[in-house]
């Protein structure tokens, strides 16, 4: 039998997923969306408590480069080299393309960019990301994060601390009738939920 995590979509490309081997996209997403960087902690914006650098730039649109201390400017230059911000002649830091930030947000939140999203927007942006090696095409039905979710609940292939319901219930001799009834009920509802999600993904 085929594992749920291996089911293919009928589409040649269902998602564009983060290339786990590419360090540039990993660094870019960290600098844009991590709340652990200090890129938002500058006057006069630090009192606004922006979640991350992307959140700040989407709200203020431009910040003075010289408002950053010297040790943070190299980080900004890294983002310049990665092509997501620019430093103009007037000394202001600005976003190169706001739509790019939308794509980066999808990658950060979900790990993928749906192919239908790119078709609907009809841009060549995805080709740029592919050429840079930042994303890879995928024909899987489930995204990598969804695959992890299913693997956690169904087997011990990717995790060693999950319920592994498939492993447990596929072999009746491993299920004791004396087991907690609430536990069986919870497992039953959880597997129903997993089935519903899978059906929705197929319908989608």
Where are these regions (language model features)?
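Preference for solvent-exposed, low-hydrophobicity sequence contexts
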Residues: 1-35
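A short mid-domain helix/strand-loop element embedded in enzyme catalytic domains
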Residues: 26-59
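Helix-boundary capping/turn motifs
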Residues: 45-55, 74-75, 142, 157-165
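Short helix-coil junctions and helix-kink-helix linkers
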Residues: 55-69
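A short, conserved structural fragment
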Residues: 76-90
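Accessory beta->alpha helical hairpin/"wing" motif in late/C-terminal subdomains of nucleic-acid enzymes
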Residues: 88-115, 167
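Flexible secondary-structure boundary motifs
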Residues: 103-155
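Charge-enriched, short contiguous segments at helix-coil
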Residues: 148-204
């Amino acid at each position: 039998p085929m594992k749920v995590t291996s089911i293919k979509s009928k589409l040649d490309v269902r998602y564009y997923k983060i290339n786990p081997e590419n360090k540039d996209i990993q660094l870019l997403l960290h600098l844009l969306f991590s709340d652990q960087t200090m890129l938002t902690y500058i006057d006069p914006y630090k009192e606004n408590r922006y979640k991350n650098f992307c959140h700040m730039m989407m709200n203020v649109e431009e910040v003075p480069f010289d408002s950053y201390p010297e040790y943070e400017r190299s980080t900004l230059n890294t983002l310049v080299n990665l092509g997501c911000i620019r430093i103009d002649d007037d000394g202001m830091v600005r976003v190169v393309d706001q739509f790019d930030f939308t794509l980066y947000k999808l990658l950060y939140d979900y790990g993928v960019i749906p192919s239908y999203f790119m078709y609907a927007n009809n841009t060549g942006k995805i080709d740029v990301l592919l050429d840079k090696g930042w994303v890879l095409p995928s024909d899987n039905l489930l995204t990598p994060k969804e695959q992890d979710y299913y693997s956690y609940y169904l087997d011990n292939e990717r995790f060693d601390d999950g319920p592994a319901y498939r492993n447990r219930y596929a072999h009746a001799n491993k299920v004791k009738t004396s087991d907690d009834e609430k536990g069986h009920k919870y497992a039953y509802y959880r597997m129903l939920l997993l089935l519903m999600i899978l059906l929705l993904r197929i319908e989608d």
